[in-house]
């Protein structure tokens, strides 16, 4: 009887190690939605209104990842438009291994102030993760795309192009994130038609769902539409909301 009472007392005094070990780990998030919002409205000696909106949605199921992005920028001064640009994209990635995946993407761009009425791109590609650590990630990718575009002067053209891109992300100890993306699009029919897009961003969290984001976007077109300059620069600040 005494041995049984001793075992019972030991069981009651011991911490529930077995129960804790059997608790299931939280399931990874399959769907993620991020919104970027920025707005400026000034009146008085100058009347200026501008807003920028960014949206990114991703859904993951085992090896397949589906993504959708959208961006909008609009600005006006003294009642007249001074900036207008829209971007959208769809992408599907399929992981072949831990660091290699194949993908298919489709993109849309409209920027009347750069002479672009519409620009479409679609094609397959391959992505390779070069660095994957707790704080740093670096990946590169290449794709062969079909491009179709129409200028604001109603000039149409279609061509094949290569797409080369790189993406880097660094997490600081405070969970602040620095990201850098670079994309190079090369026309296979006209060698002088080279386009480079670079975006540098810094995101500082205020809570689990809300953060402040500052980004600097550079778009270079070596062969712009007649009457337009080669380089566009855009600095945006605003709030980022994650769901």
Regions found by a protein language model. Give the residues of each.
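Outer-membrane beta-barrel proteins
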Residues: 23, 59-63, 91-98, 127-132, ...
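Residues that define the transmembrane beta-barrel architecture of outer-membrane proteins
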Residues: 31, 47-51, 82-86, 118-122, ...
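Transmembrane beta-strands of outer-membrane beta-barrel pores
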Residues: 39-43, 61, 72-76, 108-112, ...
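Short glycine/proline- and aromatic-enriched beta-strand/turn motifs that initiate or cap beta-hairpins
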Residues: 25-66
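Cleavable N-terminal export/targeting peptides
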Residues: 1-30
């Amino acid at each position: 009887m005494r041995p049984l009472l001793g075992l019972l007392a030991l069981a009651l005094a011991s911490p529930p190690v077995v129960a804790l070990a059997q608790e299931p780990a939280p399931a990874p998030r399959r769907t993620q939605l991020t919104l970027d919002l920025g707005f400026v409205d000034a009146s008085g000696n100058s009347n200026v209104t501008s807003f920028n909106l960014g949206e990114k949605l991703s859904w993951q199921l085992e090896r397949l990842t589906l993504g959708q992005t959208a961006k909008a920028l609009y600005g006006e001064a003294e009642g007249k438009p001074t900036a207008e640009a829209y971007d959208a994209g769809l992408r599907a990635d399929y992981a072949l291994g831990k660091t290699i995946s194949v993908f298919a993407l489709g993109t849309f761009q409209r920027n009347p102030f750069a002479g672009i009425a519409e620009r479409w791109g679609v094609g397959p590609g391959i992505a390779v993760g070069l660095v994957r650590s707790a704080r740093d990630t670096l990946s590169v990718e290449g794709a062969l795309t079909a491009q179709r575009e129409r200028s604001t002067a109603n000039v149409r053209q279609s061509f094949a192009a290569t797409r080369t891109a790189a993406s880097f992300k660094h997490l600081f100890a405070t969970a602040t994130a620095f990201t850098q993306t670079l994309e190079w699009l090369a026309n296979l029919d006209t060698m002088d038609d080279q386009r480079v897009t670079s975006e540098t961003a810094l995101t500082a969290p205020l809570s689990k769902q809300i953060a402040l984001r500052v980004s600097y976007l550079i778009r270079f077109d070596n062969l712009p539409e007649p009457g337009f300059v080669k380089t566009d620069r855009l600095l945006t600040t605003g709030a980022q909301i994650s769901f």
